[in-house]
């Protein structure tokens, strides 16, 4: 008969064996697990290094492509606007770099910028519709001129008025706007808070216009995109060509470029470019203006939704 002591010793031996098994087993599995994790970690680091190298290589290629565009851009646009002039309108979200780049490339194309006129936040938000309408319909309209009766919203009417004042009408029968009348229109809109510009001795008329806007607009931007699109479209009949240019994201609603492309009437009036923040887009601005001034068709260019091609076909 097994004594109590022997029974206790047997149980102790069993528990000891179990404990040793657990310890040895856990050590084995933990070593295996750690070894596997170390291997996976090395593989991940290898993948990260490879992806980093690929990213750096792509960045170098993009940089080289941008530098190439910058170097050859002036040759591509050479004499495209020789003897022609352009007035630039900018929205509150337009970038200074884009304005400077457009002004520069107009000069490289042989053209001249007559003025850069800024539309204020009050203008694009359209919260002062009656105030703007009263200014537009006041006695500042140049003698012999008439606003289009088809345009009823204040943004379009303001575009029509500024088109009369600042653009050379392609119709030789159109009345000539004197400098004093032009100054009156600009001063009235500036004093009422709708535009700003750097006063010069003389802001002459231009053959064409570029309206420069920003990129994507937030969904709570209200009617800003619509206001800018209608303004740009209203300028078109008064000169030899109007182009609306925006940055990456401008081809998405509710931005002005997207609004223009989605509206058949506006899309038939003005050209658009949706990548003015890149050198190819700036080159396209000049090529598109050249087409418009010389009687070509409107076009919609860039890489965003609604673009018909990346640039103007030759």
Curated annotation (Swiss-Prot):
Compartments in which it is found: Cell outer membrane
GO biological process terms on file: copper ion homeostasis; monoatomic ion transport
InterPro entries noted in UniProt: MctB
Phenotype when the gene is knocked out: Mutants show a severe growth defect in the presence of copper. Deletion causes a drastic virulence defect in guinea pigs, mostly due to a much lower bacterial burden in the lungs.
One cellular-component annotation, GO: cell outer membrane
GO molecular function: porin activity
Record function comment: Pore-forming protein, which is involved in efflux of copper across the outer membrane. Essential for copper resistance and maintenance of a low intracellular copper concentration. Required for virulence.
Protein name: Copper transporter MctB
Organism: Mycobacterium tuberculosis (strain ATCC 25618 / H37Rv)
């Amino acid at each position: 008969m097994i004594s109590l002591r022997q029974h206790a010793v047997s149980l102790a031996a069993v528990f000891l064996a179990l404990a040793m098994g657990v310890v040895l087993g856990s050590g084995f599995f933990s070593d295996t697990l750690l070894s596997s994790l170390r291997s996976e970690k090395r593989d991940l680091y290898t993948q990260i290094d490879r992806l980093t190298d690929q990213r750096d290589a792509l960045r170098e290629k993009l940089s080289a492509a941008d530098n190439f565009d910058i170097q050859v851009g002036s040759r591509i646009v050479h004499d495209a606007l020789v003897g022609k002039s352009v007035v630039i309108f900018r929205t509150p979200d337009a970038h200074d770099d884009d304005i400077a780049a457009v002004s520069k490339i107009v000069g490289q194309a042989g053209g001249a910028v007559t003025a850069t006129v800024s539309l204020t936040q009050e203008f694009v938000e359209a919260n002062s519709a009656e105030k703007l309408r009263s200014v537009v319909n006041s006695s500042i309209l140049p003698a012999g001129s008439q606003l289009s009766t088809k345009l009823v919203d204040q943004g379009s009417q303001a575009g029509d008025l500024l088109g009369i004042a600042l653009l050379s009408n392609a119709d030789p029968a159109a009345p000539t706007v004197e400098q004093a009348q032009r100054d009156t229109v600009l001063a009235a809109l500036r004093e009422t808070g709708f535009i700003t510009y750097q006063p010069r001795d003389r802001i002459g008329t231009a053959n064409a216009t570029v309206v420069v806007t920003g990129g994507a607009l937030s969904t709570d931007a209200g009617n800003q995109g619509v206001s800018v699109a209608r303004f740009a479209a209203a300028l078109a009949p008064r000169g030899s060509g109007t182009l609306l240019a925006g940055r990456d994201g401008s081809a998405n609603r509710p931005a002005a470029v997207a609004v223009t492309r989605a509206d058949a009437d506006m899309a038939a009036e003005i050209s658009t470019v949706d990548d003015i923040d890149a050198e190819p887009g700036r080159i396209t601005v000049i090529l598109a203006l050249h087409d418009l001034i010389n009687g070509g068709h409107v076009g919609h260019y860039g890489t965003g939704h609604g673009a018909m091609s990346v640039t103007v076909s030759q």
